[in-house]
């Protein structure tokens, strides 16, 4: 089995789930344990300036082996896995020569990965896949990216005749909870530009993403005994429901695709006395993004007039922006990635990211950073899987990008 696979199988067995609301950085101790493992591995490979900082960021350098000036390229992946599903006690399963039919992930629990539900599986008939055992996520997002970067770097270190400029690599914590770039030192990293290796199926190349905001809403009610509540009770649950129904019903994740934005209600907790709503707001276009946020403000203002001042408190905060605005100033990094894919036999699929990456924020911090595929599918859940050949191609693409810049 390829080295990239061996690495990946090893990495996913480390529990690195990030945790919302943690008071530590990184948010979980497991990420630091994994980071220390990566530091040891990078040192064994002979990289320079291998460093783990107090916030859990791993950085290292491959020195240039060419005499002429070439740009310093960075490759970045994140160590944490999504809190949407357990990442503890991951038991990857290898499915060789996939037959195009149902894959039984867990016989005792009757958990099946089926092409009826995931038709893209059919494309991998005859290929080797890595799946979960149905009880956890897999962690290809983004331990596949880490395995692919380190395998590419190992090739550079073991083949000194392979031309390359200075290469910087970084592995970040807490990307899945939106904090992956919070403590990232762009100046310390020292790259002219970078690529995150955090995308999905083979061929994905992304340099557009959502503009993103989060809206945390508190609805304050008045609770009295229901038998004597007339003209006194103010039920925060009903007001919260009214607020939800004032948003466009079709503009939710289940009804949108491509470049369409949405409002997404992530959680509701409450009682008559008080209800809390947690929304995310997403749109690719800045003007529409602002319109969505303004609608939230107007709804809150309206309900405060209707039910009384301070019935609604709205905490609206931008999270990240569409990196296209920054990438387009350095579009050669996208064109070079496209060419690299084509030269190693991968068809580029340039699509907008209906989400965000560390690269989105890093691009606004002065480090333009589009996103490359890992090869994985169905991230964040029990049906996550990754084809082995896609991982191998991801390594090839990384190496080809490096070569193209070194030989221009």
UniProtKB/Swiss-Prot annotation:
It holds the Pfam family M20_dimer. One of its GO terms (molecular function) is metallopeptidase activity. Keywords: Aminopeptidase, Cytoplasm, Hydrolase, Metal-binding, Metalloprotease, Protease, Zinc. Zn(2+) 1 binds at residues 78, 141, 198. Its EC number is 3.4.11.4. The active site is at residues 80, 175. GO terms for cellular component: cytosol. It catalyses: Release of the N-terminal residue from a tripeptide. This is Peptidase T. Its cofactor is Zn(2+). It is found in: Cytoplasm. Binds 2 Zn(2+) ions per subunit. It comes from the Bacteria.
């Amino acid at each position: 089995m390829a080295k990239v696979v061996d690495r990946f199988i090893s990495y996913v067995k480390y529990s690195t789930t990030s945790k919302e609301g943690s008071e530590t950085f990184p948010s979980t101790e497991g990420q630091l344990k994994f980071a220390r493992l990566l530091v040891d591995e990078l040192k064994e490979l002979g990289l320079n300036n291998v460093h783990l900082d107090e916030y859990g960021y791993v950085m290292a350098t491959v020195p240039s082996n060419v005499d002429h000036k070439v740009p310093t390229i960075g490759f970045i992946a994140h160590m944490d896995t999504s809190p949407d599903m357990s990442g503890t006690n991951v038991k990857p399963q290898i499915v060789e020569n996939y037959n195009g039919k149902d894959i039984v992930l867990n016989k005792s629990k009757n958990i099946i990965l089926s092409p009826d539900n995931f038709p893209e599986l059919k494309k991998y008939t005859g290929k080797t896949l890595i799946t979960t055992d149905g009880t956890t996520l897999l962690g290809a997002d983004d331990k596949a990216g880490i395995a692919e970067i380190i395998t590419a770097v190992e090739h550079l270190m073991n083949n000194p005749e392979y031309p390359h400029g200075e290469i910087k690599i970084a592995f970040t914590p807490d990307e899945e909870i939106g904090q992956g770039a919070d403590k990232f030192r762009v100046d310390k990293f020292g790259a002219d530009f970078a690529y995150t290796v955090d995308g999905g199926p083979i061929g994905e190349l992304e340099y557009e993403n959502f503009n993103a905001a989060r809206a945390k809403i508190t609805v304050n009610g008045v609770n009295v005994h229901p038998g004597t509540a007339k003209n006194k009770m103010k039920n925060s649950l009903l007001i919260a429901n009214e607020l939800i129904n004032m948003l466009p019903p079709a503009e939710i994740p289940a009804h949108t695709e491509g470049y369409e934005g949405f409002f997404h209600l992530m959680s509701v907790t409450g009682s008559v006395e008080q209800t809390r709503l947690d929304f995310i707001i997403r749109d690719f276009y800045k003007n529409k993004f602002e319109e969505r946020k303004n609608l939230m403000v107007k709804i809150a203002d309206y309900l405060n007039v209707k039910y009384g001042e301070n019935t609604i408190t709205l905490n609206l905060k931008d999270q990240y922006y569409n990196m296209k605005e920054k990438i387009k100033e350095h579009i050669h990094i996208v064109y070079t990635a496209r060419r690299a894919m084509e030269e190693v036999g991968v068809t580029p699929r340039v699509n907008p990211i209906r989400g965000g990456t560390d690269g989105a924020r890093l691009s606004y911090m002065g480090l333009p950073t589009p996103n490359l595929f890992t090869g994985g599918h169905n991230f964040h859940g029990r049906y996550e899987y990754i084809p082995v050949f896609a991982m191998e191609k991801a390594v090839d693409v990384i190496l080809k990008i490096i070569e193209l810049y070194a030989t221009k």
